[in-house]
Amino acid sequence: MEKNLTTGSVLKSILYFSLPYLLSYFLQTLYGMADLFIIGQFEDISSITAVSIGSQVMHMITVMIVGLAMGATVNIGQAIGAGNKKKAAKDIGNTVTLFMMLAIAGAAGLLFFIRPIVGMISTPQEAVSETVIYLTICFLGIPFITAYNIISSIFRGIGDSKSPMYFIAAACAINIILDYLFIGGLHMGAAGAALGTTCSQTISVMIALVVIMKKKTGISLSKNDFKIERKTINRLLKIGIPVALQDGFIQIAFIIITIIANRRGLDTAAAVGIVEKIISFLFLVPSSMLSTVSALGAQNIGAGKRERAQRILYYAVIITVGFGVMISIIIQFIAEPVVGLFTENAKVILLGSQYIRGYIFDCIFAGVHFSFSGYFCACGHSELSFIHNIIAILLVRIPGVYITAKVFSSLFPMGLATVGGSLLSVMICVIAYVWMKKKQGCMD
């Protein structure tokens, strides 16, 4: 059943919704980390690099799917908050139709251009063949990745963040088992990592479909709801496209950083790839707050409770800043052991510890602008989220990483360059928020 999150304690509502979301993100992150950890125990550095680079490409695709699905979460949430279940049903049906069409077309296109993609990201020659195999298998699984994220966005839109957690928990457990089978037992290398991930995601979707058929959501769907309606699609895309583009550009920035790292050699490429995995794990709290603020904010805005939506934003900022400060201090003392979990190569550990000691401060500032981005999406102004991220990427993040990589032998300054981009984003978000309040924001 849908959960009404427009009444009661704001903090309790955030915790009720965000904790399952946080656990979902944690489990989903274990996908990539498990692949990298397990392949590091059985294969050489070229296989590690192939999985690291390939998983970054897949992460970019996945976050763009999730970003586009944000339009569904917000629209469904606003409909639920307003008590309009007919509109919610239409939003759900059109979301399913649109996304499955995009998934099939997208998978076909990516498979066709797989070689240029691998070449474009400057994959080290030693890792090219395994990267191609890894991505081929993963691209074939895109319809299932899309299906999972559609289902999750629908559940979160109606206020249920627990069901997606159960789906991903099952998939994660299966993925780890299959990784040990395919990589450790059958010695399939990067192909085994990709196959384990794709198979487990497929099983997750099957479990989700069974749950949907049995679960009482309070929303009745008809065949007519699945017919494309331009007004409904436009509302979904108005919010979803800016978020998807934003997430895509962020991942492109990370891929450019990977290219810069790749050109410094295999050791640097492996170090940066490992740290990106660790950071993706530590970013669980900021990421969960973005989604929590957008979903809870949408319900409250739909119910006409704008001040409550603003309080949700304030609490989210406090939570993320507190977490960011704490984890930034801790990492300064344990950087080497953390990086060492993924490799025994002393040079990679040294470079990785340098990079993460600078990069980790991004947890503080990213948490703030993630929370603001969630609020902007809930208000229907996702273009603001897109704008601040693009400005930060083009003016600070990419130029900063390029310059520091050229000037310094240590990777610490390269990590700080990323932090500078987030700091600029925070400044822009605060200005935009003040402007929205003056203009009585959250208005279409």
Protein language model regions, located:
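Short alpha-helical transmembrane segments in multi-pass integral membrane proteins
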Residues: 1-18, 76-141, 185-241, 297-362, ...
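Residue-level signal for short hydrophobic patches within transmembrane helices
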Residues: 7, 11-30, 34, 57-64, ...
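Transmembrane helical elements of multi-pass membrane transporters/channels
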Residues: 16-35, 137, 171, 200-204, ...
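Alpha-helical transmembrane segments and their lipid-water interface positions
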Residues: 28, 32-39, 62-69, 73, ...
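Helix-terminus/linker motif at the lipid-water interface of multi-pass membrane proteins
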Residues: 30-49, 118-125, 181-188, 248-275, ...
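Small-residue hotspots at the loop-to-helix junctions and early N-terminal turns
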Residues: 43-56, 135, 194, 266-281, ...
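Small-residue-rich hydrophobic transmembrane alpha-helices
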Residues: 48-108, 145-164, 258, 271-335, ...
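Short runs within selected transmembrane alpha-helices of multi-pass transporters and secretion channels
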Residues: 138-156, 164-172, 193-206, 287-290, ...
